[in-house]
Curated annotation (Swiss-Prot):
It is an enzyme of class 2 (transferase). Keywords: Cytoplasm, Pentose shunt, Schiff base, Transferase. Belongs to the transaldolase family. Type 1 subfamily. This is Transaldolase. It comes from the Bacteria. One of its GO terms (cellular component) is cytosol. It catalyses: D-sedoheptulose 7-phosphate + D-glyceraldehyde 3-phosphate = D-erythrose 4-phosphate + beta-D-fructose 6-phosphate. The active site is at K132 (schiff-base intermediate with substrate). Homodimer. It comes from Shewanella sp. (strain MR-4). Its EC number is 2.2.1.2. It is found in: Cytoplasm. NCBIfam families: PRK12346.1 (NF009001), talAB (TIGR00874). GO terms for biological process: carbohydrate metabolic process; pentose-phosphate shunt.
Amino acid sequence: MANTLEQLKSYTTIVADTGDIEAIKRYQPEDATTNPSLILKAAQIPEYSALIDNAIAWAKLQSADIEQQIDDASDKLAVNIGVEILKLVPGRISTEVDARLSFDKEKSIAKAHKLVRLYQEAGVDKSRILIKLASTWEGICAAKELEQEGINCNLTLLFSFAQARACAEAGVYLISPFVGRILDWYKKDTGKDYDAVNDPGVVSVTEIYNYYKQHGYNTVVMGASFRNIGEIIELAGCDRLTIGPSLLEELANSQVTIQPKLIPASTTVAAGEPLTEAQFRWDFNQDPMAVDKLAEGIRNFAIDQGKLEVMLKAKLAN
């Protein structure tokens, strides 16, 4: 009998949530996603030292200003890792815009253009890239403009229905609703444990998936941030699921028989008027979990980006 991972692949596109090339070789996902925390982790793998050296050397050629060099080296390293991953996956790589730009539409767009240009200079077409942006109002507006230019986006740190609805209305290519971080918040808030069926993160992604299919939106739903394989099994049938190496290994070692849980609606109905900025901000603000987790997620990605830059600054000084 096929293991649980192989069964899951027949219902859902599997994406590796890692910058670890060895893990990607092992589990053969369709796509891969990275973020500042994963790039920081990957940068500490000895096999990646040549990619870092290349980024440092390139950055020194671009500018004499140390702050600009750090910025350039950081972007180049993320792209170098992405290029290596794309040698192993048939699909796409998601590369994230600096979380510190989460509330600046214009700078987010400029950073996206720079990342796409670096990939193109490395021989990678934009059709194989997803630009990751936080699901703030500004991030969603940036994505709307990028999509109109033919640059596909992955809207991340998505914790609420309001964020999901705004992304669909903006014509975003893909969203990454977080499952495990929603569970974390509710467990801490209520002191309760949840089984996979009643897991608040699973319930959230299911609601978003059903809404998208019911209204005929083409935006891809890619569940993310899992705490256990029960959550993953309950979301079998979701368009895509991005899963870290430890849970990919657990799925590969499991023999649990699974069935699709998410099934697209057979008929569609027209959606209502798009959310205004004021409606979006009000609806989002009504969800304390989403407000907490989005703010925390942006802060934590910014912290890890800062740690990466400290490491790069030391190398640039040599």
